[in-house]
Amino acid sequence: MSEPTVNFHIQTRLTEFKIPTELIKKNFKAVQKQIEKQKKSIGEDVAKVKKNNKLPTAMKIEMINKLIKSFEIFQKRLRTSINRDEVFRSRIIARLENLSELANYTVKTNVVLESNASPIDSDDNRDESSVTPKSMEDEDRPLDLHNVNLINWYRDQTNLLIIDYLIKSNTRSDQNIGLQLLKSISQTNPKFTKLIDYDLYDNFNKVFVSIIENHDLSLVIAWFNENRSFLKKANSNLEFEINYCKFLSLIEEGDVNEAIKFSQVNLSPYGNKGNYQSQEFMNHESNLNKLKEIGGLLVYMAINEKANAQIDKSIPFSSSLVINSPRFKEYKKLLSNERWDSLSQCFIENFTKLYGISRNYPLFIYLSAGLSSLKTKSCYCNTENTIFKQYEESSESNKNIYKKDLAVLTDKKYRGPNKYYKLLNKINHCPVCSPELYKLSKNLPYAQLITSIFNNPFKLPNGNIYPFDKLLNPSEKYLSEKNTLLRMGKIKDPLTREIFLIDDCVRVYPA
């Protein structure tokens, strides 16, 4: 069945329940630790009071008051954790209710059958094994795509996908346009805040922006410490990437002595294979290769500083050879932004693994599914259309996705293969060919359209395909012209009005 059903939407939205579930587990473990810590602390303090019988009564009262205050603080923390747990559970309930609404928008196909059922098909005579539960029947029914409420439901889901994308892809540290959009929509639809884990995504985006834009390690270090136990079990390499970036930052700032001390404590252990588990040998090889370059980097910095100091003077021949060597340029590359890209990708990988979510934007996943069902071999693959080749060349020269000039892509004159559209003074509105979706649809598979809507199709020299009957029997308006053309062995394209010889037409067999 090609029509969407309730079951289809349940399957595609399972990831929406993973994050709240993981947050509940995480919060529960934190509460357990708080209780154990408080229990141990109170036990030790009470033991001290009991053990010292010679303590003055005033001091004992003071110690007991401290115990009461610490317990009150513990109660506040516990209440905060309980409230947090209730928020996470309310999100799961809201998402279940949101999916449950779909049961009201299905096509009612069994109403007539039930009313016309014969008396023989009574409950007593019916085979129980053949009876399907009503809930399962509702879930397998196709959705009524003409239902206004269902259209509004889809519109809400589209807004959620857009908000999700905007929050995650934000590149500004001062504001997040995705959160602003969510706040605006939630004023009229308060349930929106429970249908998306905006706070977690906002925290993710802040850490990512702090790494890739601000080159700041404080937020990613805090996130690592918060999730240290999971990352250790997952054999994460994030700690090494953080320490490696910290070391290179110290080198870049010129604090060589501090960098050497830092590397001895925080980087040297990663060179020992015995500190890795059997599943981490790939991390060991990668880390070891990076550590080998550290010593040469110090030499590079010394030679580079000396060369900069002697700009107006002649550089020694030996130093000149080193500076112009390919290996020297490799050390220079270590201090580029590649290290921050590597750290950001490592953070994304660990974040998605922690919460069991996809690294791709859900909006892109849905768009890809729709585009691949529309994509044909005629889409922007016409060899006469060179605009996309020009785009590829310009994109290779500037790979930064945030700073790329999109003026070329948004100009309507650059849309798709417009060979025939120009003749009609129209624009190609194919979404696959559109500049906005070109990059996303570029590597998608073609749609497998195995059914031809034409009877006895023929291809004209201009590439257009029509049923041969339509070419021989045009409308009454062009009947006299048709007879004249046929006597000359010619036919006219109904769309472009171009005239071709019948012998130049080719019988095609669409696959």
Curated annotation (Swiss-Prot):
Its main location: cytoplasm. GO terms for cellular component: cytoplasm; GID complex; nucleus. It holds the Pfam family CTLH. Residues 117-140 are annotated as: Disordered. The keyword Zinc-finger applies. GO terms for biological process: negative regulation of gluconeogenesis; proteasome-mediated ubiquitin-dependent protein catabolic process. Residues 200-258 form the CTLH domain. Disulfide bonds: none annotated. Belongs to the FYV10 family. This is Protein FYV10. The lineage of its organism: Eukaryota, Fungi, Dikarya, Ascomycota, Saccharomycotina. The gene is FYV10.
